[in-house]
Amino acid sequence: MRNMVSEISDLSLAKEKSEAQFIARNPKSNDFHCKACDSLPGGNTRTVLHGAPFPIFIEAGYGSKLRDVDGHEYTDFLNELTAGIYGHSNPVIKKALMQGFDEIGISLGGTTTCELNYAEALKSRFLSIEKIRFCNSGTEANITAIIAARKFTGKRAVIAMHGGYHGGPLSFAHGISPYNMDSQDFILCEYNNSTQFKELVNSSQDIAAVIVEAMQGAGGAIPADKEFMQTIQLECEKNDIVFILDEVMTSRLSPGGLQQIYCLKPDLTTLGKYLGGGLPFGAFGGRADIMSCFDPRLPGSLSHSGTFNNDTLTLTAGYVGLTELYTPEAVKRLNALGDGLRKDIESYCHNTKMSITGLGSIMNIHFTESGRVNSYNDTAGEVIELKDLLWMDLLKEGFWIARRGMITLSLVLTESELEAFKLTIKAWIHRRMSLIRI
């Protein structure tokens, strides 16, 4: 067996070579990045898209394809980190937006039937939602759901999960950040640890809510154990704690969201991403008694305003996308394709540091010394250089994924594109076997 020093040296050389090729292939992206640094801190306004030596600048998207400013075309296997489920410039969405401009208009400053129609459509899909409100992002939905839980219970503390992500000010990848919103009010639990969760619930009488993903998205597409989620639901019910299920990413995994698969009935559900039809969107909803905290007819109710909460274009695009494109049949088909893709890639990973996690149309590639990822803790020792190498090598082959290894599918990907991606991954494993073999 080759020693670890040699392996690290070989990996460093391979990455340096790929990075040099990356720089040579993308001079215009480099130039745009340098120019952007004059106006934007680090040339960036969305941290997740930053990466050394510089990010690729995308010029256009069409169907399942992206084109960058240097003229390279990619098949998109990231799809806006789950938000781009309809592909790029979907004709049905485009038609709905143009009709919205022509027949409804924008910036109306009043209540419209758009919000009523979409609220009813979402309620019919996500059965735990009795009442719903709209906002502008999944982050805002999660923040406002926590505010509702505090108002409803009169309590303050919130249990979140290590590795969880509920928006920039609610990020728990490295514990509780002192820069998180109300960081002193959060209690952290290990994901999939039912025993610890019960202990935390019993340790305080001031817990207003639990916020959790049934599959950690930004944390690496790590699914929850069903027993863990059932424990959360039961303990919340027993202790008058509001159970907030973050389905901003995962609502796409079945017709009724991941809560349908896990047989859950959360008190509040948060939504976002693709449900805006490609435009900024967030929503939160659930039990009518909790949501009545926002009923402006009631004394002492919470104020929840936002100029674009009922934006006509977003609600029109979201409604058309959900009712005409991402129908229950389409949901099942897309997630079956995702399960098949993940299982095929998994079969290529035997005896390597590479593994793949996820459910349905959302998945994530990992590189660990053991070749196994069963919890967020297992990602602590990820070989980031291998993720970087895979990402740069896939760019050369014309495929776009997240640098962190995330893959999400869209409705417009064809079976031939899926097959080409699988074969490229298989060939990459063979080519880089000396670097990834256990």
From Swiss-Prot:
Entry GO terms, CC: mitochondrion
Cofactors (names): pyridoxal 5'-phosphate
Cysteine disulfide links: none
Subcellular location: Mitochondrion
Keyword annotations from UniProtKB, A to Z: Aminotransferase, Mitochondrion, Pyridoxal phosphate, Transferase
PTM annotation (N6-(pyridoxal phosphate)lysine): residues: K273
Coiled coil: none
One Pfam family linked to the record: Aminotran_3
Keyword Repeat among UniProt keywords: no
GO BP term (any one): porphyrin-containing compound biosynthetic process
MF terms in GO: glutamate-1-semialdehyde 2,1-aminomutase activity; pyridoxal phosphate binding; transaminase activity
UniProt-listed Enzyme Commission number(s): 2.6.-.-
Protein family (similarity comment): Belongs to the class-III pyridoxal-phosphate-dependent aminotransferase family.
Name of this chain's protein: Uncharacterized aminotransferase C417.11c
Species per Swiss-Prot/TrEMBL record: Schizosaccharomyces pombe (strain 972 / ATCC 24843)
